[in-house]
A protein has these predicted regions:
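Charged, cofactor-coupling segments
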Residues: 3-7, 16-42, 226, 292-328
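Active-site microenvironments in enzyme catalytic cores
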Residues: 3-7, 15, 22, 44-250, ...
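Cationic, low-complexity basic patches in intrinsically disordered or flexible, solvent-exposed regions
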Residues: 10
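Residue-level recognition of short, solvent-exposed, well-ordered loop/turn junctions
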Residues: 93, 100, 281, 303-304
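Conserved metal-binding segment of the jelly-roll/cupin
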Residues: 143, 149-150, 280-297, 310-313
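Short, structured beta-strand/loop micro-motifs enriched in basic residues and often containing a Trp
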Residues: 150-153, 263-271, 288-293
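Short, solvent-exposed loop/turn positions at domain surfaces
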Residues: 157-159, 274, 296
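Glycine-rich active-site loops that engage anionic ligands at enzyme catalytic sites
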Residues: 230, 254-281
Length: 328
């Protein structure tokens, strides 16, 4: 019997049966255990979405066939999962790399400058300069251990008082590539996810290291600071990834409301940039930046008792309770 679930919408969600995560198929009205559906098929032995991505093109074709087979009533009742007994896990567990875009929406850049992120006029001018002839995308790494599910708690450590939110469109690679040109970048993408790049601003901008200042590890990689999912939506089911609405609410109040087409550097340009530095592999995650409306702009931060609702249009919505870390 299924007890847990990761995410894979339309052609998949990830569930854990008997405590082990396995692929699942979400058909809207019913969730199917792919472990049962696939046991005699081409995907035999595949135990996670992460493994599906290693050979994504044929696996995606097989998943479509499986979904059609099940949707027409050919799947037996033993494959149905009790939705009341599942827990959403991150769609992709143990990704090789998690890459995030910094300062990639004009409104977000301006609000961060206004909040005093730039300490000098020169820094201010540099932050506001987004002439692509002179400026490259800014990408940082986030620890995969920060991943959490779409309905898991966001845990605030006792070492920070400025935990902030950032709704983002995340994508997952389905092919390996190096020096991928932007015009071919989407050929390497398997699908998309909703994510929240939770950030500790007082760690991200270190006053105790004035010559270095920025600490991306300390600001971004705390446990639970990367809620992902609930679904992994294959690229074929996203008609235009540049026209997706991104919204985030804190305790019912809308804080962010943007559109993916407002990115400074497109997802394709970010893939091109990242792949000039490092080989991108199946299962790698790239999160593409956040629009304006973060808490730092107004000096407002998450606190225990808040509820964060994060959504990217067509990719599913998250709902995370904010709790304080219990320290023994």
């Amino acid at each position: 019997h299924a007890t847990l679930r990761e995410g894979f919408e339309r052609d998949g969600s990830e569930i854990a049966a008997c405590g082990c995560a396995v692929p699942g198929v979400d058909l809207g009205s019913v969730l199917l255990s792919a472990r049962c559906v696939l046991r005699g098929g081409a995907l035999l032995g595949v135990s996670s979405i992460r493994l599906l991505l290693d050979d994504w093109d044929p696996n995606f074709e097989a998943l479509c066939e499986m979904a059609t087979f099940a949707a027409t009533g050919n799947a037996g009742p033993e494959v149905a999962v009790d939705l009341g007994a599942v827990r959403y896990l991150p769609p992709i567990l143990n990704p090789g790399k998690m890459m995030y875009a910094a300062a990639n929406y004009g409104g977000h850049i301006r609000e961060m400058v206004a909040a005093g992120t730039a300490k000098t006029d020169e820094e201010r001018d540099n932050m506001l300069d987004r002439d692509k002839g002179r400026v490259r995308p800014y990408t940082f790494l986030k620890a995969a251990s920060a991943l959490s599910g779409a309905y898991d708690d966001i845990v605030i450590p006792p070492d920070t008082t400025k935990v902030d939110w950032e709704v983002e469109l995340a994508l997952a690679m389905g092919r390996s590539g190096k020096r991928i040109p932007a015009e071919k970048a989407m050929d390497y993408v398997a699908g998309f996810m909703t994510t929240n790049d939770v950030s500790a601003r007082d760690w991200n901008m270190r006053e105790d290291w004035p010559t270095l200042r920025t600490d991306w590890f300390g600001g971004k990689s705390h446990d639970t600071f990367a809620p992902m999912g609930p679904y992994f939506v294959p690229r074929a089911f996203v008609p235009d990834h540049t026209k997706l609405r991104l919204t985030l609410k804190v305790s019912g109040e809308t804080k962010q409301d943007g559109i993916t087409g407002d990115m400074v550097f497109s997802a394709e340009e970010q893939i091109e940039h990242a792949s000039t530095l490092i080989t991108l592999d199946p299962g790698d995650i790239l999160s593409t930046g956040t629009p304006e409306g973060v808490g730092h702009a107004s000096g407002t931060y998450l606190k225990a008792g808040d509820v964060v609702e994060t959504e990217v249009e067509g990719l599913g919505a998250q709902r995370n309770n904010v709790v304080a870390e219990i320290v023994d």
